[in-house]
Amino acid sequence: MKRYIILFAVLILGTVKANAQTKLKLYGGKNHDQFLGCIDCSTEDLNSIWCNFGEYGSVHKVNSIWNELGKYGSDKSDYSPFNKKAKYPPPVLDQKGKSHGFMTINKSNPKRSWDSFVNQITEQRDEIVKDIPAYHDRVFHDFHN
C-alpha cells in the first residue's frame, strides 16, 4: 500500500511540474507564421516577451507586441492583440502546438484565450510597458508564491 501512495505522489508531482513548465508562445501574421515570443518565459530568455533586450520584449523592436507603432503592438493593426477589431490576433500555443485561444483585448471574441494571465496582459498593457521586467517579476512572484 505504501508503494502505491508513493507512486501516486510521484505521478501527481510530475503532472504539476509538467504543467508548470508549459511554455506558451505567440504567433502573429495572417497565417500565424511569425513568432512573437514566449509568454511565460523568464526576463533573461531572449525569446521572452518580458526581456527588454530581446526581439520580443522591447518597445522598439518590429516583432514585439509592446511596440505601439508596430504591426503587432498597435491598437490599430489587424494583427495586434490590443486592437478590439483585429482580424488576425495572435494565437497562443503551447510547446506541443495546442491552441490556448487568441490573445486579444476583444472580450466578445469567442476564440479569445481562456488563460487569465494572457487576458491580463492585454488589459494591463499601459502599465506593463512602463517597466516590462518589473511587471513580470511582480506577477510571476505572486503566481509562484
Sequence positions of predicted segments:
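Sec-dependent N-terminal signal peptides
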Residues: 4-13
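Repetitive, compositionally biased segments used for assembly/scaffolding
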Residues: 20-145
